[in-house]
């Protein structure tokens, strides 16, 4: 069993001291049977290899393909194929504020069609669940640069009664200073990174949103919450503990 100290401080254990407890799995999030299997990973790897600079020799491409095949579980095959962590869970502290509830807004036909497409996709991915909540926010459909529709949640009223998290974000100058003398740089991108962060079960009902059919709430962190950036930075600091500003930014 691998053990990770995420506290940032040394920890000491006595011989024979229990380190963990095992419990049966009671809930699985996002475990959707995939029809893609190995073929799905193969297609993703082929696409990545095809994007390599033409000046890279075939031997290097082959070794890269072997490396990617070795770590296929960390590759995303499609928009709903993503990870999930509860190392850090997002909290929404509203103290004793009354639940905020917006009246259902009228949506245009194209917007309603976009919502009808989005909701089932989020349900299948395990990102949302049906909600019976006193909180309610509306969906706002906006156009992306490519002309397609994106569904966002109007959390302005919720944010107004949420206690702000002042967790510090990295300073740009410190990040630039840490790269002094470095020659090679790599970047890693997460598929829908916020959606890979769990929302604490006690706070899920506060993310409830309404549409022309039902109300739903998020199981994972959506965009639009005022403290989402702080939560994600806290998660990255835990995951990269001991590496940040040394070999990782």
Residue spans for each PLM region:
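Retroelement reverse transcriptase polymerase core
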Residues: 4-16, 25-249
């Amino acid at each position: 069993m691998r053990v990770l100290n995420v506290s940032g401080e040394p920890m000491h254990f006595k011989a024979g001291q229990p380190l963990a407890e095992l419990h049966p799995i009671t809930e699985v999030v996002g475990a959707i049977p995939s029809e893609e299997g190995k073929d799905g990973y193969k297609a993703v790897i082929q696409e990545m290899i095809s994007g390599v600079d033409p000046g890279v020799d075939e031997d290097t491409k082959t070794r890269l393909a072997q490396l990617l095949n070795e770590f296929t579980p960390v590759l995303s095959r499609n928009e709903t194929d993503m990870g999930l962590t509860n190392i850090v869970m997002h909290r929404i502290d509203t103290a004793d504020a009354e639940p905020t509830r917006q009246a259902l807004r009228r949506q245009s036909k194209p917007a309603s069609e976009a919502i009808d497409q989005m909701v089932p996709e989020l349900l299948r991915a395990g990102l949302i669940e049906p909600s019976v909540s006193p909180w309610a926010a509306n969906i706002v459909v906006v156009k992306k640069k490519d002309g397609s529709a994106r569904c966002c949640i109007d959390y302005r009223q919720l944010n107004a009664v949420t206690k702000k998290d002042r967790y510090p974000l990295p300073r740009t100058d410190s990040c630039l200073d840490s790269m002094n003398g470095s020659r090679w740089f790599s970047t890693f991108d997460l598929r829908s990174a916020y959606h890979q962060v769990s929302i604490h079960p006690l706070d899920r009902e506060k993310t409830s949103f309404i549409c022309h059919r039902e109300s739903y709430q998020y199981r994972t962190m959506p965009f639009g919450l005022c403290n989402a950036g702080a939560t994600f930075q806290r998660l990255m600091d835990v995951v990269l503990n001991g590496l940040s500003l040394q070999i990782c930014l």
